[in-house]
Amino acid sequence: MFMHLEVYYYAFILMAHMKTCCGWSVNNFLMTGPKAYLIYSSSVAAGAQSGIEECKYQFAWDRWKCPERALQLSTHSGLRSANRETAFFHAISSAGVMYTLTRNCSLGDFDNCGCDDTRNGQRGGQGWLWGGCSDNVGFGEVISKQFVDALETGQDARAAMNLHNNEVGRKAVKGTMQRTCKCHGVSGSCTTQTCWLQLPEFREVGNYLKEKYHRAVKVDLLRGAGNSAASRGAIAETFNSISRKELVHLEDSPDYCLENRTLGLPGTEGRECLRKGKNLSKWEKRTCKRLCGDCGLAVEERRAETVSSCNCKFHWCCAVKCEQCRKTVTKYYCVKRSKRVKNDNASRRKSYRLKKKH
């Protein structure tokens, strides 16, 4: 329930900013007045939600796991930080809003928008022409920019950072578009192709931005800069020199190993980690080291018995009957090291040093 309220709060403040701070004119084809905002509000809310869900997926096994408070931290000016996690959150939120608006446009949810057929009939490359129904990312980009960027009314370095990362998110959607083609020719031959652009799965956008997160650029500017024309010029010059495909941040990240109630950080104590599994990636297999060991915590193995339906059979007519199977599941958690473990480790290190001397 909390998340839904936060998402609709996000959509509300986007619309409020649109009504109070920005002229609502997009290529002279949008309606004006409250009805115009309501048309897109559900898509904005859904897009913000998809951004949050993707953020939580991408950071599920990181020390920072995109907590529910991330949206609040992003939209409340008094609480916002300017680290690389904030950069990712702005980008994925912006991407989510643009992606959803674009998809809903193609689905026919808006009267003033449809397929992008502006290049249809033009030669795209060797043996293929533009055609079909391309997803209208241009529409999604323009509308999402009007909504999302309206949140940043300041002219300081942090506002510039957020606007930059919003743009990175929109570029990510455009950059991951996929070309789909259909063959034309006699008897199934492919003498020529008609091609169009489609949105990828949103997971592709998330994966793309997670890579950008790892390579985010730190900008050395004072957060309070922007009180004079000279400082605003310096900020603009700095950000204009950085590619709109690279995430930027102003601050180093806090220590996510430790609990910090002021920042709403729970720390990693009590977190579940992964050790074994056929389908685990290398990153996932290292979670116990990353979340526990590297944070000075021990790994505790816990076993629990679960009950689930199994051996299901269809019986005529028309029921499915299942057995209830019990299974022991092993899970791993980060816990504080006991004094005994600490003393044992200290003794081993001392013994090792003595052996080296001899």
From Swiss-Prot:
GO biological process: canonical Wnt signaling pathway; cell fate commitment; commissural neuron axon guidance; embryonic pattern specification; eye development; eye field cell fate commitment involved in camera-type eye formation; forebrain development; forebrain neuron differentiation
Function as written in the Swiss-Prot or TrEMBL entry: Ligand for fzd8a, a member of the G-protein coupled frizzled receptor family. May play a role in the establishment of polarity in the nervous system. Involved in canonical Wnt signaling pathway. During embryonic development, required for the acquisition of caudal diencephalic fate. Antagonizes eye specification.
Record keywords: Developmental protein, Disulfide bond, Extracellular matrix, Glycoprotein, Lipoprotein, Secreted, Signal, Wnt signaling pathway
Disulphide-bonded residues: C55-C66, C105-C113, C115-C133, C181-C195, C183-C190, C257-C295, C273-C288, C292-C334, C310-C325, C312-C322, C317-C318
Gene that encodes it: wnt8b
Signal sequence residues: 1-23
UniProt PTM comment: Palmitoleoylation is required for efficient binding to frizzled receptors. Depalmitoleoylation leads to Wnt signaling pathway inhibition.
Family per similarity comment: Belongs to the Wnt family.
PROSITE patterns per the UniProt record, alphabetical: WNT1 (PS00246)
GO cellular component: extracellular space
InterPro entries reported in the protein's UniProt record: Wnt, Wnt8, Wnt_C, Wnt_CS
Lipidation feature positions (O-palmitoleoyl serine): S187
Keyword set includes Repeat: no
Biological source species: Danio rerio (Zebrafish)
Compartments where located: Secreted, Extracellular space, Extracellular matrix
Pfam families in the cross-refs: wnt (PF00110)
Phylogenetic placement of the source organism: Eukaryota, Metazoa, Chordata, Craniata, Vertebrata
GO molecular function, one term: cytokine activity
Stated name of the protein: Protein Wnt-8b
Annotated tissue distribution: Hindbrain r1, 2 and 5.
Chief location category: secreted
Glycosylation sites: N104, N260, N279, N345
